[in-house]
Amino acid sequence: YRRQRQMCIRDSTTVSLIRGVLRGLKDHGYKIGGFNAYATSDVLVGAGLSSSAAFEVVVGTIISGLYNDMKINSVEIAQISQYAENVFFKKPCGLMDQMACSVGGMVNIDFKDPTKPIVKKVPTEFEKYDYSLCIVDTKGDHVDLTDDYAMIPSEMKKVANFLGEDYLRDCDSNEFYIRLDEIREAVGDRPVLRAIHFFNEEHNVKNAVSSLENGKFVEFLDAIRKSGNSSFKYLQNVYTTRDIQHQNISVALALSESLLRNYGVCRVHGGGFAGTCLLYTSDAAD
């Protein structure tokens, strides 16, 4: 699959991202100006592959090079890109996609202070272990799924607020489980399940990073498997409940598990609900 197109000034989506990045750069005190650009990309649009984040970062990097002597660092470009998507594109995304695109490679990010995120590169020599990272296009897209995405942080914050905090990361998981009945009664079961995913995922991420840093690839795969299962069962971002008859990702995951067996792991990729799956496959599976 390959897509080529010349950016059109009448394309409101593209224009909103460009204008948002330029406004953000200007507000941060950087010089801005015009430029002509032609883009060729293999990134699937609306499939959970950070296509909008990648585009925002490209625009920011172009302006950094043309007008600011390439002095705008990758973290600031990511933050400005997020601003463009939140304010101009009207999508309530976090900072993860933009940061991954801007910094590059596999990264571990701590977002406790969004103004000063802690970013650490993680080694990713998959070929060393005879494994490949694959993306499976399930032929769905993210059109009209903004509300589904927005409900995830909204529901998690309901649980955090019940426990007296703004964010789940500041909550005591032991208190959460002790008061589970109260929380279920107050906010409902889906927010509770999504909170359980959050607490699980904090451990999964730490285990995945530690495993890669210490060359324990089997443990890394186990962390990815647990993360994917938690996303499906507790975060519930594999399909939209507004269209239960179309579950492309669910079917793709079922088939992938059946085909891979012990030769790899799979999980939903990106924001979920539609789009792509992520697979780590053993070269021996060929």
List where the protein language model places each region:
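ATP-dependent small-molecule kinase catalytic core of the GHMP/sugar-kinase superfamily
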Residues: 65-214
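A short glycine/serine-rich beta->alpha loop
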Residues: 10-11, 41-49, 85-90, 194
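Single conserved hydrophobic/aromatic residue that forms the stacking wall/gate
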Residues: 1-5, 9, 280-286
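Beta-strand segments within the central parallel beta-sheet cores of soluble alpha/beta enzyme folds
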Residues: 34-40, 71-83, 221-226
